[in-house]
C-alpha cells in the first residue's frame, strides 16, 4: 500500500462502530462477560428501566404519573407474537447520547437518561435533580411524539466540522480522535451546503489508492496512488451522496421521520432562520433515542411486540424480487479476499455486508467502518487474506482494546420481535441486521453441533485462527440458541424500521425506504 492514512494510535483509540465500548443505555452491560451475555439473551427485548417510583412521590401529581409509568414498566415490552402489525401506536419520544457520534460532538437531548441514571445510583441527590426528571417525563407525556419539535432533541456542544482543504489523513484522524463516524466538510466557515465525510469516503479513497476504482480526475488519481496529500473536499465527491437535507429546529419529528425513513442517513438541524447548523440528527441516533425511551410510551408496545414477519419488513421471499418495503440482501463468500468485500460495499453503496459460507450460512459481518483496520501499510496483507480471517482479526483486536472477548450478534429471525431487533441494532451500533432461517426445534433441543462452522456465529469461534475447529467451551442451551445462526434469507435496516414508523404513525404514508438509494448516482469528476 502506497500511503499511510492512520495515526499510530488509531488501532488503540478506536472502538468498532458495530460493537460498543459502553452499552449501558442499550441494556447490554459490559462490566463482565457473564453479565453481558445474560443481558443480551434474557433482557434484549426489554427497554431500559424508568426511574424507580420512590423518586417521584414528592407530590400527588408525581405519584399519579409514576403509577401509570410503573404499570407500563411492569408489562415491559414483552414479546407477544399475537399482536398484529395493524395494531395502533400513537406516541413516542426520543432521547440518547452515543459513544460513537454520527456527526460532530452533538448531543441529542440527554436530560431524561442522565437524570434517570443519577437518581437511580445516587439517592442523596438534590431535589432539583428529581424535579428535572419529573418535568422531563411530564413534558414528554403531554404531547404526541409526532409534534415534538427538533429543538427539544438537540443540544449544541462543540459541533465538530473540518475544512475541505485539509487532507484525507487529517479528516480520518479527526474521526478517530472524537470517536465519530462522519464529519461535516465546509468549503468555508459557516457553509450551509456542506457534504459529510464518512467511512464510505475513506473506503473509496483506499480503493482509489489500490487502483481498484477509477475517477475522471487524473490528478487526484495520481496523487492518491503516489501517496501525496489529497484534500478531503475532493474525496467526498467520489462517493454518491444524497442532497444535504436541512430542517429548522421548529420542525417536528413527523417531518424528519419522513426523510430518514426514505433512506437518508442524517439531517442537519438549523436555527429558525436556517442560517446556522445547530446539530445533526442521524438514523442511528433516532433509533437509539426511540429505544431508550420506549417504556415511557406504552402505545408503542403492539408495534414493538410484532414480529418482522408480521410487519412485512426485512424478510425476503427467495423466489421473488425485493419490493419497495424490503432491502436487498448483499453477501460475500467467507473465502473471498477482503478487498473484494470492500469493493462490493463501495459498488453497492451499503454500510455493511454479510459473510456467508458455501451453503449460504451466515458466518459474520463486515462493516464499512472496519476499513480503519486496514489503513496502515503494515495491515496491507489483510486486504488479500480471506473475509473469514479478517473477522477473526477484528474480534481479537476488539478483545485487546476492550480487555475482554467480544461477541456481537448481527442476526435475527423472521419471528424476532421488532423490540429485539431494535435492541440488537442499538447494542451493536449497526445500521442493519441479517435475517437467518430459525434453527430446527430438534437442533435446539438436542444441541446438535455437527457443523459448528455454520451453525454457530463466528463471533463465538473466529477468535481461533482455525475456523474449522470446534470451540472448546460449550455454551448453555440458552446462549447456544441466541448465538446460533443459519441460512441468510434477509436483512433489516434502520431505514426499514424508520419507514414503517413513518407509514404507520405519520402522514408520510408513501415513504419508500429505497428512494434515497435510487437518488445516489455516480458522480463524474
UniProtKB/Swiss-Prot annotation:
Main location: cytoplasm
Gene3D superfamilies hit by this protein: CBS-domain
Superkingdom in the source lineage: Eukaryota
Name of the molecule in the record: Protein SDS23
Family as reported in the entry's similarity comment: Belongs to the SDS23 family.
Keyword Repeat attributed: yes
Record lineage: Eukaryota, Fungi, Dikarya, Ascomycota, Saccharomycotina
Entry GO CC: cytoplasm; nucleus
Protein role: Involved in DNA replication and cell separation.
Record-level Gene Ontology MF annotations: protein serine/threonine phosphatase inhibitor activity
Subcellular location: Cytoplasm; Nucleus
A Gene Ontology biological process term: regulation of mitotic metaphase/anaphase transition
Gene: SDS23
Pfam families: CBS (PF00571)
Extent of Polar residues compositional bias: 59-73, 443-458, 466-475
Transmembrane region(s): none
UniProt-annotated stretches for the region Disordered: 1-81, 438-475
Native organism: Vanderwaltozyma polyspora (strain ATCC 22028 / DSM 70294 / BCRC 21397 / CBS 2163 / NBRC 10782 / NRRL Y-8283 / UCD 57-17)
